[in-house]
Amino acid sequence: MRFPLPAARSLSLLSFILPLLLFSLLLYSRDASAQANLPIFDGNENGYGVNGFQNYSWATVNFAATYGGSNCVSVISTTNYQAVYFGHSDFPTAAYRALDFWINGGPSGGQPVQVAGPLNGSPPVEYYLGTLQTNVWQHFTIPLSALGTANATNCSGFWIQVATGTTQTVFYVCGAQLLANPAPATVHLNVNAANVIRTADTRWFGFNTAVWDSDLDTPITSNLLKQCGCTTLRFPGGSLSDLYHWETGKTTNPVTSWATSFPNFIQIATNIGGAQVFITANYGTGTSNEAAAWVASANITNHCNFKYWEIGNEVYGASWEADSNSLPHDPVTYATRAAGYIQLMKAQDPTIKIGAVALPGEDSSNTNYPGEMVTNPVTGVVHYGWTPMMLSTFKKMGIYPDFLIYHDYPEYTSSGFNSSDSDPLLLQVADNYCPSALSDWASAAQSLRMQLTDYLGGPTSSNIELCVTENNSDAGAEGRQMTSIVNGLYLADSLGSLMKTEFNSCIWWDLRNGPSTGGDFDSTLYGWRPFGDEGITWGTTNYPVYYAEKLLQYFVRGGDSVLNPSSDYLLLSDYAVQRTNGALTLLVINKDVTTNFNAQIVLTNYFPAPEATIQSFGIAQDEATRTNAPVALQDIAETNFALATTNFTYSFPAGTLTLFTFAPAAVQLHSSSASPGKFILKYQGQAKVPYVLQESSNLLSWVSVSTNISAGAVSSLTNAVSATQQFWRVIWIP
């Protein structure tokens, strides 16, 4: 499908020597706008796209070309319909309104070109630009609606393509970007305390620990974990798990000794006070007997009661995970051996829960071993992926894991500037429902549950839970984003989105990893630290992800009721919880690092006391760290908010986590006579709020008589009257 040229605007009178100045002005206006535009290719000297856009072109291209004084992409089409393709993993476009770029026909001109924005799985709409002019930079702004990509969840980039089947001379492209939609004057946030979607799990607040961490078993680490509310730990750490032999504390290939042993881990898990523990047994180079002996040592000999055990790490990973089996990275071999692990490990301790490695998507990680395919018994479709093959093998043996293990990293940087890192898109991925990419928590959980149901069926599948034992923004080389406030925002947004799914654990990668300069430090990424690090701390330095985790302990804990609030603007996300003590907490994340957003907050089915507590961490605190301000200014800020009602407004600062804690309003009381010597105390409180009945003889000292969970209606308590009991009250105690 084509669209005529008048729908775009062409500045054909501009000379080809002007685009560098004009593009600079374009970038300046982007920074000053209410919401930042998204650069695709900004003419950087490194020869790559930015914000995760990669060179997927099938024309002859040079991403490090110059023409007329501008850094640009040169494009030569030597055969039919070749294109320069700024490709990307599926991303949402709701925040953007138009594709904007400059194009020059070069010394020959006359090339007929068209533009497309493919969506994963759908044919693209072709938008015809016409023929290019000779040595003239033309400026095009194409509405995303004209490309069929407006408000998409799965845009996979944009290409500029020669519209004929003939060879064409070189042309040039620069300044490609997505123009942002204007931010609303007021964002609307709505919280309904009656809209409960699940109960919070205590395993959501954890960290991976690693054998290379020489500071693991120290008071410093114990205090650090307690300060940020850690409830869950995983050991021994990522891909080393498939090389690690617990009895010696060494890894193989090559044989390496490490700073931290399993006894060291036992100490730290014990010292932080009853942590839930996940242990990853060695599948890649280990044996089921070795794993069973580990269970016996931990839970029988040392009485650790470590409940959760994994069989291997990312054993589907042919390019990174150790696997010495005759058929490495094979789901059938894995399930067959895992069944033996399950039997021997549970023979040592029948109370443990054992997990198997899985992936969303029925065709994910196709190993291509001959004959390995399975038909989905519900849909009748043949699939070749890891999880269907694994589950089918388990079913044949009649032996099943207790949980499936999932790891999620939205980005991957192989090295330097050739990166998928993008601050704006990272902060949109966790709650962007996108079944085609399976990059969000909801899609991943639904896919895993569907596979369990389809391939195992019946009560067997419903008894298997889903657990996340690794999560961070980037699985590759660490760059600026890792240690910036953006990763702290992502940590909170990731957990907030995960809370709305059936995933029952969330373990961040990792506690300590170490600074690195091998990742992406492009100027489009926010931040000031000259290194990246997947950990939350190093030496005496705590990164923004540490403070984000620290803040979350005041937002939600195991047993709380997870609510389902709404926001009408994707860059201001909200998550809400009703705590077991009856308080309501609201976490709001401003994902834009340049703009404050005004919001109207409406609370339904909850009446707050007029004074709330606000805790926050964001750019202001991170800047205090950069400027070496007093330590108190670098930590979570706390203020009182005296305007809490069921409908109020608030301005949320850019790049900041803001947490409201609302106490319930006071109960309404009255009394009436009952039988002689007794009276009825009537009160009306709020649903799910525990109220304490107290009595006093002098209004100075009070004695608690009973605690009652209100149903929201009028409640009656019949009390005996005595000379020593003259006063009664019903209060909420935090």
Predicted regions and their residues:
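Short carbohydrate-recognition loop motifs
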Residues: 60-82
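Extracellular ligand-binding interfaces
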Residues: 76-154, 165-172, 177-178
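N-terminal catalytic cores of secreted or lumenal carbohydrate-active enzymes
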Residues: 184-402, 406-408
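Noncatalytic carbohydrate-binding groove/subsite architecture in carbohydrate-active enzymes
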Residues: 331-491, 501
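Aromatic/acidic polysaccharide-binding cleft in carbohydrate-active enzymes
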Residues: 467-556, 560-574, 580
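Carbohydrate-binding surface patches
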Residues: 568-610, 614-617, 655-663, 674-675
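Acidic, Ser/Thr/Pro-rich beta/coil linker or hinge segments at domain junctions
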Residues: 606-653
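Short, composition-biased motifs enriched in small/polar/acidic residues
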Residues: 665-734
